[in-house]
Each structure stands twice: as C-alpha cells, then as structure tokens.
C-alpha cells in the first residue's frame, strides 16, 4: 500500500525511516512542507500517487481539506499523553514549573498526561490561547499570543503544535517545546 506522509520536511526522514522499518509492506510516499499554508499546493493533483494520506495532526489535515476534496482516505496521527509526558520531563529538567501556555486545544489530553504523571491541579497551570483564523498572519499571531503569556509570568514555557511557531519563539528566546507524535502514536495510526 502506498502511504502518503504529509509532515514538515524536518521530520520527514525520521518518520519515513520509522514507518519503513516497522511496516515494510508500506510504500512511503513523502509530501514534505515547510509552512502549513503550503500543504494544499503540495498535495494538489497528487492524491493518485498514494492510497491514503497520513497527516502530522488534525490542523494540517483541516487546512488541506479547505482547498482539496479528499479522493483517498486521509488520516491524522493523534496527539497523546505520552508525547506530552516527554515534554513535561524536558521542561522540569530545564527548571521550569508546569505553568504551560499552549496552542493545542485538547485539554483532555493534557489532563490525561497530568494524571499519568501523578500531578495534581495545584501543581500545574494550563493556559490555552484563543483559536485563531488561518490567515497569512496566523503563525505570527499564534507566537505572539504564546509569548505574551510567558513574558507576563502567567506561564513558564510554551507547548506548540506548529513548527513555524516553535522556530519563531526560539529566535525570540522564549522557552518553547514542540509537541511531536511519539513512535507509539505513529505505530498505532499506521497499523
């Protein structure tokens, strides 16, 4: 089966290598992008190259579906508590309190991760930025909203689901972590 992988170019080699190793029967067809706004252009007219598409997350899939009608199955790798636990450990090792600003609007995933880590509500604080419209200024607006929460002291660090936001905040020296799917998340989705 030909599996079209639609993810940021920076993750492509690692993700494709993992899938090819774990699922040798799958023929991986890469569809890398740099910016979420490029996804429709990257996919336009190319659905016939794959039997299904696998997106890094729901946001990327949603963005593509605004301009392209799926003619093959489109799946997304779900975000999981295990991916968040990895980031909590990294943040704690760096000395950050678990006061988090995020653009991932899935509170149940955060709550599940907090419970799995044995953390109480008194030990954590979660601040969701408002959902923003997908415009040409989306990435900048998202980064600024997260940055504002850290600079105000409301949050100690950020967790983002967008690669461009991650890089923008790193350039601004704002503590930020990129929420990526774990190998287990990928495995569960492909199998």
Residue positions per predicted region:
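Alpha-helical/coil-rich non-catalytic "connector" segments in signaling and regulatory proteins
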Residues: 1-191
